[in-house]
């Protein structure tokens, strides 16, 4: 936990950008009957029946100090999707960076080994060296600022039925562009000092050192 909190204290550095990465599934649901539009005194209505069209995955890449975010929509959630998104982060979003600091959850797909399972060894090694990973602790996903952005995405864009991955991609891209135009940042205020005080119960108990 303290590792992530110390990283959040770092000042903005374009050569060493700090990004937060998280992902979430989105179930694709299509209406079986056309929804009824709203009229004077009557809200819009949709039938309770719907058709399941599978599940898509959304990867959120958020740079809190710059107010930029990039959302990638994929059909599956595997190591290959994560590695491919991270390659895009390296070579498309931050090609000039010397090192990219990444805060992310400790999922089984979020591993440097994913690069070797997706790319040739030389390319995998190049990508591993592009990143400096800082993992949130178990049950500590709230430390990941990308989770805040995903919550905003759900509230503002995904709180309704979306029938297919094409529509989902279009809706997410429109949300991303608007939010980036507004340069929405996150000012993180929870510090290591706060953690040692307010979350003291999560720390191992100090038993002292005995001199011999």
Please state what every model-predicted region is.
Residues 20-22, 61, 67, 86, ...:
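Mobile genetic element proteins and their domesticated derivatives, centered on retroelements
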Residues 44-51, 123-145, 160-164:
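RNase H-like polynucleotidyl transferase catalytic core
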Residues 32, 167-212:
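C-terminal domain-tail junction helix/linker
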Residues 80-101:
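Short, basic/hydrophobic alpha-helical segments
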Residues 69, 138, 146-165, 178-183:
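Active-site proximal helix-loop segment of RNase H-like, two-metal nucleases, encompassing DDE(D)
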Residues 1-87, 199:
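Extended, low-complexity cationic-aromatic segments
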Residues 91-92, 98, 121, 204-212:
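Intrinsically disordered, low-complexity and often Lys/Arg-enriched segments
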Residues 97-111:
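Acidic/histidine-rich, metal-coordinating catalytic segments
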């Amino acid at each position: 936990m303290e590792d992530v909190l110390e990283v959040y204290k770092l000042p903005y550095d374009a050569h060493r950008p700090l990004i937060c990465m998280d992902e979430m599934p989105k179930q694709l649901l299509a209406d079986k009957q056309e929804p009824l539009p709203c009229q004077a005194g009557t809200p819009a209505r949709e039938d309770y029946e719907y058709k399941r069209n599978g599940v898509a995955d959304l990867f959120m890449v958020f740079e809190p100090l710059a107010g930029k975010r990039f959302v990638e929509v994929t059909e599956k959630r595997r190591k290959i999707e994560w590695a491919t998104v991270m390659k895009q982060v390296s070579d498309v979003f931050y090609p000039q960076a010397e090192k990219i600091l990444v805060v992310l959850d400790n999922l089984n797909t979020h591993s440097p080994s994913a690069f070797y399972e997706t790319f040739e060894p030389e390319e995998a090694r190049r990508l591993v060296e592009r990143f400096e990973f800082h993992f949130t602790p178990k049950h500590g996903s709230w430390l990941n600022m990308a989770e805040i952005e995903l919550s905003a995405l759900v509230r503002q864009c995904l709180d309704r039925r979306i029938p297919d991955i094409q529509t989902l991609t279009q809706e997410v891209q429109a949300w991303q562009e608007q939010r980036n135009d507004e340069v929405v940042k996150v000012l993180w205020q929870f510090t290591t000092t706060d953690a040692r005080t307010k979350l003291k119960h999560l720390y191992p108990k100090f038993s002292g050192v005995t001199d011999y």
